[in-house]
Structure formats: structure tokens, C-alpha cells
Swiss-Prot record:
Taxonomic path: Bacteria, Pseudomonadati, Pseudomonadota, Gammaproteobacteria, Vibrionales
Organism of derivation: Vibrio vulnificus (strain YJ016)
Single annotated GO MF: glucuronate isomerase activity
Domain of life: Bacteria
The EC number(s) this enzyme carries: 5.3.1.12
Pfam family, one: UxaC
Protein name per UniProt: Uronate isomerase
Family designation: Belongs to the metallo-dependent hydrolases superfamily. Uronate isomerase family.
Keywords annotated in UniProt: Isomerase
Pathway the protein contributes to: Carbohydrate metabolism; pentose and glucuronate interconversion
Length: 470
């Protein structure tokens, strides 16, 4: 019987153990999509205590606490950091079977070095003091943790109107060797149905010094901001798409009319929203191809389901879930609009509903080519699939329907500096899966064949994919 969270955690066979310890463990982290605050990296934030670094903005933990009956004051309210932390300590023993239990103890082990205690109300006070002492040292600032965890690149998520001043400051600081690069998140520019759309057009126009009245004005403003992002090292875009919309692109005059009507406050039809969204996203995708960027499409979240809590806390507070609207037809046509002129960029497709895994794994095969290995990717298990079964299912289905060997691997998609252990979690699951194949005779038990593939999936593929610009 294995001990909990031992050195061979999740590694069920000898080949898996060798793959992990000899090939995966020491690989750097290329965290190409996250939600870290770049200001906290630029300013090298020193966290006051463990509760602050652990619980601020972490809606995964917040959902668990609510399910455990913790009152909202101790989750997002005005309670002290210590009281919120103790509420989390009360919750953790109830999360057995949930990845939160694994993540919590992995985060205590790395970077804090705590391996001799299970987190609970009984151990929480000792762990609080032990971790707070470490958090007061230079090795446990925002930058210190990134360096401890062997991060070489972090791709943040940024709005086209952002100044990118913090990315600039980080890039100009020779004392810090981690790349922190912006990623372009243009959702508000193509979701014409949003209540904030008109206000956003005004803000975008101000930043770009262009009055946005016609469709071409919008494209010109976006183009200026694309150049700004590219100059600051951006190599990726990310579109959050709750519902994939596609409609044949109308004439520019019709798009001008749609934009004018929306800016005047008129509500557009579903078809008109789809026409506008398609036109903007296809134009953006072609520009990404010209710039050598990667386009990421995160598809299928059903957001802000609780009106009451949305009004109280706003978005990204733990009230989102998996959507179930089919989208294969629309997605294929959206990608094809770019591919018809050979202007589809490198693209990563993520689905939130695991029902769509096989569809996505086959969809990527429709648009490969151009001499680019793995040009179109089926992204790692996202959000609610960011757990043992979800990641394993995604990789197994990719291997059966595509090429696992070309997979760009894991990303944290997180707001927390302690989430880098999710790369360790992923690597252990990957090595166990490949090791089982070898032990069962499904692939050769040859580490000279399997080891380099594991190394590439952990790091090499992502580095090449995001840094090649052809």
C-alpha cells in the first residue's frame, strides 16, 4: 500500500515511475495561458500570509467552501485572512475525492516543503505560522515562487485596451529571468450583444485614437492595439466563447449598419450577432496568422448562472458551469472561413463539456497542414476537466484520434502563484498513462522512445509551438 502523496503519487507502475522521475520532473514550466495579475509580478508582491496567497480570487476553492456550508462572509466577505483560512481548513477534509484535496497538499509540499501533515483544523495553525515565515522571505515573493517552480514563461490574459505597462517593466528588468508575456483577449470587441459593448467601443476608440463609427474603424482600432501587443511580446490570443456563433459574413455596408444600430442602443437578433461575431473573429484570426500568433478558443462555459450572486460579487466568483449547446457545425465553418484563404493561425481548441472531446479531437484533423506539426491542437482538460479523469480522458482521446506526441501539454489557467503544482499533477497522470501502455504491451517499453515524447509534451512542444512565428 502506498502512502498518500508519496514520491510515486499517481504512478502505478515501474515504467511510469521512471518516465516521471527521469524525464518529466525536471522539465521547466511553459505556462502559456494563465490569469496571473502582471502588476503583482512587476511589483514582486510579498504576500502577507498563507490565506492571502491561497484564497484570493480562487473560485475553485470558493465553490468547495460553499458546498461545505461555509458562509459567504468567510469566503469573499469582510472576514480576516486568518478566519477565511481557518474556514478553508475546515473545508479541506471534506474534499476527499475532489482534486482540491490533492492540489492543497501538493501546494503545501511545493514550494513550502510541508510533507509531514495533512491539512485540517488541527494542523492549520502550525502550517499558518510555518508558511507565513517563508512568505516573508525573498524566495517566496511572486517572482521568487515562479523561479522556485522553474517557470520560464507565463502568458497572462489581457484586454486589448490594456497599457501593458507591467509587462514592459518586467521585460526591462534584467534581474528576473522569467518571461511574462501578454495574451490578447478580445471578447468584448466581437460580442456585440453585451450590455457594455457601446461603452467598450468608446474605450477602445480612445486608446487607439480612433472614433469607432463604422466597421472599418473598429478593425483599424483593433489593428493598432494588435501592433501594441505584438511589440510587447504577445504570441497568443484567447477567445472565451460561451456559444459558438457562425453566419456568412455580410457586406461591409451591412456590418456598418449593424454596428451603428447597436451603438445607438438597439438590440440585435441572434443572426445579426452571429454575423458580426463571425466577421470580427475571422478578421482577427487572419491577422493572428500574419503576426505568427497562436489563437486559443475556450468553448462552452455557461457563466454567471446565479443572478443574485452575480449582482453581489460580479463575474468569475464561482457561479459558472458546463454548457451543453452543440457547436460542431459552427466551429467547423468558423475555422474554414480562415482556412479557405490559408490564413488559419496555429489554433488550440478547448471544450468544457467532455461530451465534446471526440468531436474536438477529430475536428483538429480537418485543418492540419502547412508543414507545421500539430498546427491545430485539442487543448488540455480545461477548468472542470482539470482533474485526473478529465486530463486522462482528453489525452487518451487525443492519442486515439490524433497525435499525442505533438500535444502542447498543460497550462495552469489560474490566478494563483501556487498553482504551478498542477503541472506536476498533469505530468504524473501523463507518465502513468504512458507507463500503463508500456506495461500492457500496447507500446514498446523503450524509454529512449517514450522518454523524449514525455519531455516534449511537458515542455518542448509548447516552447516550439509558441515561439515559432512562421
Amino acid at each position: 500500500m502506498k502512502n498518500f502523496l508519496c514520491e510515486d503519487f499517481l504512478l502505478s507502475n515501474e515504467t511510469a515511475r521512471r518516465l516521471y522521475h527521469e524525464h518529466a520532473f525536471h522539465q521547466p514550466i511553459y505556462d502559456y495561458h494563465c490569469h496571473l495579475n502582471p502588476a503583482e509580478v512587476a511589483q514582486n508582491r510579498q504576500f502577507d500570509n498563507l490565506g492571502q496567497i491561497w484564497l484570493e480570487g480562487d473560485h475553485y476553492k470558493w465553490r468547495g467552501m460553499r458546498s461545505a456550508g461555509i458562509e459567504e462572509r468567510l469566503i469573499t466577505g469582510d472576514a480576516s485572512d486568518y478566519d477565511k483560512y481557518m474556514a478553508w481548513a475546515k473545508t479541506v477534509p471534506q474534499t476527499l475525492g475532489n482534486p482540491l484535496y490533492h492540489w492543497t497538499h501538493l501546494e503545501l509540499r511545493r514550494p513550502f516543503g510541508i510533507t509531514n501533515a495533512l491539512f485540517s483544523p488541527d494542523t492549520a495553525d502550525q502550517i499558518w505560522h510555518q508558511c507565513n515565515e517563508l512568505l516573508a522571505t525573498p524566495e517566496f515573493t511572486a517572482r521568487g515562487i515562479m523561479q522556485q517552480m522553474n517557470v520560464v514563461m507565463a502568458g497572462t490574459t489581457d484586454d486589448p485596451i490594456d497599457s501593458l505597462e507591467h509587462h514592459k517593466a518586467i521585460a526591462e528588468d534584467d534581474t528576473f529571468n522569467v518571461k511574462v508575456l501578454p495574451s490578447w483577449r478580445p471578447d468584448k470587441a466581437f460580442k456585440i450583444e453585451l450590455d457594455v459593448f457601446a461603452d467598450y467601443m468608446h474605450k477602445l476608440g480612445e486608446v487607439a485614437d480612433i472614433e469607432i463609427r463604422r466597421f472599418d474603424d473598429l478593425l483599424s482600432a483593433l489593428d493598432k492595439r494588435l501592433a501594441h501587443f505584438d511589440a510587447h511580446g504577445c504570441r497568443a490570443a484567447d477567445h472565451g466563447i460561451e456559444i459558438v456563433r457562425y453566419a456568412p459574413i455580410p457586406s461591409e455596408a451591412d456590418l456598418d449598419a449593424l454596428l451603428a444600430r447597436r451603438l445607438s442602443g438597439e438590440v440585435l437578433s441572434e443572426l445579426e450577432c452571429a454575423q458580426f461575431s463571425t466577421a470580427v473573429q475571422v478578421w482577427l484570426g487572419k491577422r493572428y496568422a500574419q503576426l505568427g500568433w497562436v489563437m486559443q478558443l475556450h468553448i462552452g462555459a455557461q457563466r454567471n448562472n446565479s443572478t443574485r450572486m452575480f449582482q453581489l460579487l460580479g463575474a468569475d466568483a464561482g457561479f459558472d458551469s458546463i454548457g451543453d449547446r452543440p457547436f460542431a457545425f459552427e466551429l467547423a465553418h468558423l475555422l474554414d472561413e480562415m482556412d479557405q484563404t490559408n490564413e488559419l493561425p496555429r489554433t488550440i481548441l478547448y471544450c468544457l463539456n467532455p461530451r465534446d472531446n471526440e468531436m474536438m479531437a477529430t475536428m483538429i484533423g480537418n485543418f492540419q497542414g502547412g508543414g507545421i506539426a500539430g498546427k491545430v491542437q485539442f487543448g488540455s482538460g480545461w477548468w472542470f476537466n482539470d482533474q485526473k479523469d478529465g486530463m486522462q480522458r482528453q489525452m487518451e482521446q487525443l492519442s486515439q484520434l490524433g497525435l499525442l506526441s505533438q500535444f502542447v501539454g498543460m497550462l495552469t489557467d489560474s490566478r494563483s502563484f501556487l498553482s504551478y503544482t498542477r503541472h506536476e499533477y498533469f505530468r504524473r497522470i501523463l507518465c502513468d498513462m504512458v507507463g500503463r501502455w508500456a506495461e500492457n504491451g500496447e507500446v514498446p517499453n523503450d524509454l529512449s522512445l517514450l522518454g523524449p515524447m514525455v519531455e516534449d509534451i511537458c515542455f518542448g512542444n509548447a516552447k516550439r509551438y509558441f515561439e515559432e512565428r512562421a
